[in-house]
Design a protein with these regions (language model features):
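Active-site acidic-Proline motif in GNAT/NAT acetyltransferases
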Residues: 100-102, 106, 135
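Short glycine-rich hinge loops at helix-strand junctions in the catalytic core
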Residues: 107, 124, 147
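Short amphipathic helical patch at the helix-1/turn junction of helix-turn-helix
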Residues: 79, 133-134
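Short glycine/proline-centered loop/turn elements that form peptide/ligand docking sites
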Residues: 113, 137-138, 158-161
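Residues forming the Rossmann-fold NAD(P)(H) cofactor-binding site
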Residues: 110
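Acetyl-CoA-dependent GNAT
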Residues: 2-12, 16-22, 27-102, 113-115, ...
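Conserved GNAT acetyl-CoA-binding A-motif
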Residues: 121-132
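Conserved catalytic-core motifs of GNAT/GCN5-like acyltransferases
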Residues: 131-132, 144, 149-166
Length: 174
C-alpha cells in the first residue's frame, strides 16, 4: 500500500529496487563521493550496493525494508532506503535519501520526503527517524531544512572505516 500511496502523491514513478537494479543505483551513488567519504575509505562498488539492498537493522525482517527508486521520465532521480516498524512499532527508519547529482537543489528529495511523510502518516506511523554522520554538513543542513529534530550525538562503529564515527540521531513526528 505504501508504494501505491507514494505513486499517487508524487509526479514520479516509484519502484521497489532489487539486485537487478544495481548498475542504475551504482551510477547514481558513485557521483556522491563526498557522502561516501563519511562512511568508507574507497569509492562505492557494486558489492557495496548489493549489500545495502540486503542489509537489515537488528530484529528487522526483509519485508520491512523498502529500497525505493523514484523516476522522473524514466530517469532515477531519488533513492530512499526505508525500514518500517524500526526501531519500534509505528516508527519508520530512513537509512538513506540520495538525489541524482545533476538534480540537486531542484527539490526532488524534498518532494519525495514530503510525500513519504504523508504516506507513512496515512499508514498509521507516528515518527520518521534517521541518523547521519556529524561530519556530513550537507546532510545536517538538508535534515534541518526538512524539519528533523536533532537528537543525541553518539559514536557508532563503522566496519568499513575500522573506527567509530559520530552520528546525529534525528526524528520528525508525522
Amino acid at each position: 500500500m505504501l508504494l501505491q500511496r507514494l505513486d499517487f502523491l508524487l509526479p514520479y514513478t516509484v519502484k521497489r529496487l532489487t539486485p537487478a537494479d544495481v548498475d542504475e543505483i551504482l551510477a547514481l551513488q558513485a557521483k556522491h563521493s563526498e557522502y561516501h567519504q563519511h562512511y568508507q575509505t574507497s569509492p562505492v562498488t557494486k558489492a557495496d550496493i548489493l549489500a545495502e539492498l540486503e542489509t537489515l537493522p537488528p530484529k528487522a525482517l526483509p519485508e520491512q525494508k523498502f529500497y525505493l527508486g523514484f523516476y522522473a521520465q524514466d530517469e532515477l532521480v531519488v533513492l530512499v532506503d526505508l525500514v518500517l516498524d524500526h526501531p519500534q512499532a509505528n516508527c519508520a527508519w530512513l537509512g538513506l535519501v540520495m538525489t541524482e547529482k545533476t538534480k540537486l537543489r531542484q527539490h526532488y528529495a524534498t518532494k519525495v520526503l514530503t510525500a513519504l511523510r504523508s504516506a507513512l502518516k496515512r499508514e498509521g506511523y507516528k515518527e520518521l527517524m534517521t541518523s547521519s554522520a556529524l561530519s556530513d554538513v550537507n546532510a545536517q543542513a538538508f535534515l534541518n531544512a526538512q524539519g528533523f529534530e536533532q537528537g543525541m550525538v553518539t559514536a557508532v562503529y563503522d566496519p568499513k572505516l575500522g573506527h567509530d564515527i559520530q552520528v546525529v540521531l534525528r526524528g520528525i513526528e508525522l
